[in-house]
């Protein structure tokens, strides 16, 4: 039975490519089927990039995918951490496959595929630090910040912040591949971006830079301090970015949350100041913006998995439109 399901999934993927696009000018990456998940189907593509270092791309198809419907698309940062606790650095995972499939089956969430965007390992912070805000840091502060980040990851030197190229990889390479290769709705209202910690910053940045692409940004445990300690300069440049780019006339919906334990204990006061910016920008709470606090929640995948259903329903719930 499992071999039949694998064959069926691969057939559906291949049939989703429009005939007019099946020519030698379009690169179709090698795709493997992984057996590490509990529900649905997980594919791993080797998609080369001109913007960032080459890495795997994970595409999870829910059990509903075989039913012939077009699906929404959720892009998620830190793809290494989403599906398999046996392969993660801390033995935890988001349990994305179990949670999304359950919500779809219970009619709480519209049919959705999940695209796992892998990070660059010890260069993750340089890929996931929003570039426009970073450019507004003073040179002395930025040098100290990124030197400390490089030292923490045992890098011999710092690297240029590369988040703009990471977003180009997502928007110009990954999304076109997903749109032409899978049965998806490709409009912005059917497209969301999600991440935690630095991935939360990048989700905010993605919708700010590409509001025509992403209709919803889901930002969990957003790492507003940017580095390893409290400071005023980094939250200030992020607040300025929100003021100028995260406005109701530009973006669809945006979700923030935070816990109160471990690293998340730093976030509450900063998030409240960001909420004031959103209020000043005329966002309407519980409509096009929401911020939630989770008492006792820590900065880890188990905590994010425990509340994952809430941002998913906010983005793609049956009554979310």
Residue ranges and their predicted role:
Residues 1-4:
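Positively charged n-region of N-terminal signal peptides that target proteins for export
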Residues 8-9:
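Residue-level signal for mature regions of secreted extracellular proteins and peptides
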Residues 20-321:
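Non-catalytic cap/lid and distal C-terminal segments of serine-dependent acyl enzymes
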């Amino acid at each position: 039975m499992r071999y039949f399901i694998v064959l069926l999934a691969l057939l559906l993927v291949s049939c989703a490519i429009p005939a007019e696009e099946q020519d030698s000018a379009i690169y179709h990456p090698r795709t493997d089927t992984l057996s590490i998940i509990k529900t649905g189907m997980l594919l791993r593509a080797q998609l080369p990039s001109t913007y960032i270092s080459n890495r795997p791309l994970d595409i999870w198809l829910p059990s509903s995918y075989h039913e012939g419907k077009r699906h929404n698309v959720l892009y998620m940062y830190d793809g290494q951490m989403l599906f398999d606790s046996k392969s993660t650095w801390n033995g935890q995972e988001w349990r994305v496959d179990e949670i999304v499939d359950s919500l779809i089956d219970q009619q709480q969430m519209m049919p959705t595929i999940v695209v796992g965007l892998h990070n660059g390992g010890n260069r993750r912070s340089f890929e996931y630090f929003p570039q426009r805000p970073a450019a507004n840091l003073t040179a002395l502060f930025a040098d100290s910040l990124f030197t400390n980040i490089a030292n923490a990851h045992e890098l011999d030197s710092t690297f240029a912040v590369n988040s703009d190229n990471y977003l180009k990889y997502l928007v110009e390479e990954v999304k076109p591949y997903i749109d032409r290769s899978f049965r998806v709705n490709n409009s912005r209202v059917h497209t969301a971006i999600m991440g935690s910690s630095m991935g939360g910053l990048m989700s905010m940045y993605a919708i700010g830079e590409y509001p025509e692409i992403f209709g919803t940004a889901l930002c969990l445990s957003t790492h507003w301090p940017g580095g390893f300690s409290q400071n005023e300069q980094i939250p200030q440049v992020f607040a300025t970015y929100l003021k100028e780019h995260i406005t109701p006339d530009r973006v669809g919906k945006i979700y923030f949350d935070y816990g109160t334990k471990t690293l998340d204990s730093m976030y509450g006061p900063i998030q409240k100041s960001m909420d004031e910016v959103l209020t000043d920008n005329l966002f309407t709470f519980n409509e096009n913006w929401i911020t939630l606090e989770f008492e006792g929640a820590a900065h880890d995948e188990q905590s994010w998995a425990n509340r994952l259903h809430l941002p998913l329903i906010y983005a793609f719930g049956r009554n979310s439109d």
